Curated annotation (Swiss-Prot):
Record's subcellular location: Cytoplasm
Family matches, as Pfam families: Radical_SAM
Cofactors named for this entry: [4Fe-4S] cluster
An example Gene Ontology CC term for this record: cytoplasm
Residues annotated to bind [4Fe-4S] cluster 2: C86, C90, C93
Descriptive protein name: Lipoyl synthase 1
InterPro entries, sorted: Aldolase_TIM, Elp3/MiaA/NifB-like_rSAM, Lipoyl_synth, rSAM
Recorded catalytic activity of this chain's protein: [[Fe-S] cluster scaffold protein carrying a second [4Fe-4S](2+) cluster] + N(6)-octanoyl-L-lysyl-[protein] + 2 oxidized [2Fe-2S]-[ferredoxin] + 2 S-adenosyl-L-methionine + 4 H(+) = [[Fe-S] cluster scaffold protein] + N(6)-[(R)-dihydrolipoyl]-L-lysyl-[protein] + 4 Fe(3+) + 2 hydrogen sulfide + 2 5'-deoxyadenosine + 2 L-methionine + 2 reduced [2Fe-2S]-[ferredoxin]
Name of the encoding gene: lipA1
Higher taxonomy: Bacteria, Pseudomonadati, Pseudomonadota, Alphaproteobacteria, Hyphomicrobiales
UniProt EC number: 2.8.1.8
Length: 318
């Protein structure tokens, strides 16, 4: 069977076989405000070497993040645990789909060692969806959090989780490990779920974020969406309201970028001034923090944003 090949990784490997028979989806040319420089700095190379030496995966590489050069130059990386293969096939995502391998029992400790080597004050841990596991990987998340706490007590920990759909008790396991920030992305507006995120349920994700606050109100909650997928402005504003009803603290909004022609097309490149408008509206709805720009991604500037988030909570409490 013909497969889409990841031409970045070495050796080349099959990727997105489920998308092979889809027709190509053409996107408009990228505007100037989207373009970024290719990564080639010493800091970038050092970060890559540490990731490789510890046998780890990062969402920076797997998802083709446009900010990888900037972040890795500063030795900031978002570690992706539980392998590099996802059990879902979202139309926007560049992470490969298939049957994942068994969990690596050494991974939590390997991640903790990499965090120590990079000297991270704030680390972001995400994962693929693991619908094949009874708990969706919740205990592995918890073990990773605990390993980082033991190795780097002063490092703050942000997690970006899957939705643990139909995994009873999984969320409670993760929250009990007490990450500093719990992020779960809605990704898009409800009307686009069928074509963009068919394996997920919008209101399940809203409820998951709300439940985190019910379990531990001290944990910051965060969520993000992409724009440029065919949504309307009023739908984005409704997402803001839904997230605030779940007491979510931090909202990110970024431009969707098409990984390959087999993925969902970019319907529109949203101009920077429209992102600024979204940010202003979101603040009026009560979010402690909002980041909205074409290149905003969940983990971009996460450390700096965490410091600002704490300051905003303290100011709000006064």
């Amino acid at each position: 069977m013909v497969v889409i090949v990841d031409t970045i990784s070495n050796p080349l490997r099959p990727r997105h076989p489920e998308k092979v028979n889809r027709p190509d989806s053409a996107s408009p040319p990228k505007p100037d405000w989207i373009r970024v420089r290719a990564p080639n700095t010493r800091g970038y190379a050092d970060t890559r070497n540490i990731v490789r030496a510890n046998g780890l995966h990062t969402v920076c590489e797997e998802a083709g993040c446009p900010n990888i050069g900037e972040c890795w130059d500063k030795k900031h990386a978002t570690f992706m645990i539980m392998g590099d293969t996802c059990t879902r096939a979202c139309a926007f995502c560049n992470v490969k789909t298939g049957l994942p391998n068994a969990l690596d029992a050494d991974e939590p400790q390997n991640v903790a060692e990499a965090v120590a080597k990079l000297g991270l004050a704030h680390v972001v841990i995400t994962s693929v969806d693991r619908d094949d596991l009874a708990d969706g990987g919740a205990e592995h998340f918890a073990q990773t959090i605990r390993a980082i706490r033991a190795a780097c007590p002063s490092t703050t920990i942000e997690i970006l989780t899957p939705d643990f759909l139909r995994k009873e008790g999984a969320l409670e396991v993760v929250v009990a490990a007490r990450p500093d920030v719990f992020n779960h992305n809605l990704e898009t507006v409800p009307s686009r779920y069928l074509t963009v995120r068919p394996g997920a349920r919008y209101f399940h994700s809203i409820r998951l974020l709300q439940r985190v606050k019910e379990l531990d109100a001290s944990i910051f909650t965060k969520s993000g969406i992409m724009v440029g997928l065919g949504e309307e402005r009023h739908e984005v504003q409704q997402v803001m309201d839904d997230l605030r009803s779940a007491d979510v603290d931090f909202l990110t909004i970024g431009q969707y970028l098409q990984p390959t022609r087999k993925h969902h097309a970019v319907m529109r490149y949203v101009p920077p001034d429209e992102f600024s408008s979204y940010e202003k509206v979101a603040y009026t709805k009560g979010f402690l923090m909002v980041s909205a720009s074409p290149l905003t991604r969940s983990s971009h500037h996460a450390g700096e944003d965490f410091a600002r988030l704490k300051a905003a909570r303290a100011a709000h409490a006064r």
